[in-house]
Structures are given as C-alpha cells and as structure tokens.
C-alpha cells in the first residue's frame, strides 16, 4: 500500500485548512518540538519536551530549561560560546599575570 502522508507528515491533522505555506511552517516547528535531543548531562539521545521551554531526560531524570520548540536556541548557543570565550580569555590573563609575577 502506498504511503499516504508523503509530503504533509505531522501536519496531516490539519487537512486542507490554514493554507499550505502556514502548514509548512508549523511542520518545521512540530518536527523539532517532537524530536529527541541529546542530553548534556548523560549524553544519551533521550531528551523530550515536557512543556513550553521545559525538557526532560528519561534516563538521568534531569529537567532542563531550553527553547520553546528546540532544546537550544541560536541566541543561547551564541551566549554560551561568548561566555566560554571570555572565561578562557580571563584564565589566560590570570596565567600570564602569575607568570609575570614569578619573573
């Protein structure tokens, strides 16, 4: 038997309502919202969305605050990399100051 939801996928529940372009946008959000993500604590791919912005890992029982539809949002990734870069820079400056103090 042929697959009946080749294009519509998860948005088949909306039928012909709301227009094709809006259903495509909703499809993108719903796929990311229902997907499983990797846990930053235990490393297993078992993090699922519990509520808006709340994500739970089944094996390690951790609850993570994240984005509404995705576990990590692009602004959160940017902020995290900036903080890591500043932390590394601060450690390098502290090490250089300690080395200068020694000499």
Curated annotation (Swiss-Prot):
UniProt keyword Ribonucleoprotein, yes or no: yes
Gene Ontology CC: ribonucleoprotein complex; ribosome
Alphabetically ordered keywords of this record: Ribonucleoprotein, Ribosomal protein
Residue stretches spanning the membrane: none
Leader sequence residues: none
GO molecular function, one term: structural constituent of ribosome
One of the GO biological process terms: translation
Pfam families: Ribosomal_L37ae
Family, as annotated: Belongs to the eukaryotic ribosomal protein eL43 family.
Designated name of the protein: Large ribosomal subunit protein eL43
Organism: Tetrahymena thermophila (strain SB210)
């Amino acid at each position: 038997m042929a697959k009946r939801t080749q294009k519509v996928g998860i948005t088949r529940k909306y039928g012909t309502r709301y227009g094709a372009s809006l259903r495509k946008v909703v499809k993108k959000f719903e796929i990311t919202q229902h997907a499983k993500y990797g846990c930053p604590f235990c490393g297993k791919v078992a993090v699922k969305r519990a509520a808006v912005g709340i994500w739970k890992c089944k094996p390690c029982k951790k609850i993570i605050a994240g984005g509404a539809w995705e576990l990590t949002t692009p602004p959160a990734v940017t902020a995290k990399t900036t903080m890591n870069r500043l932390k590394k820079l601060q450690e390098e400056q502290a090490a250089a100051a300690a080395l200068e103090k020694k000499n």
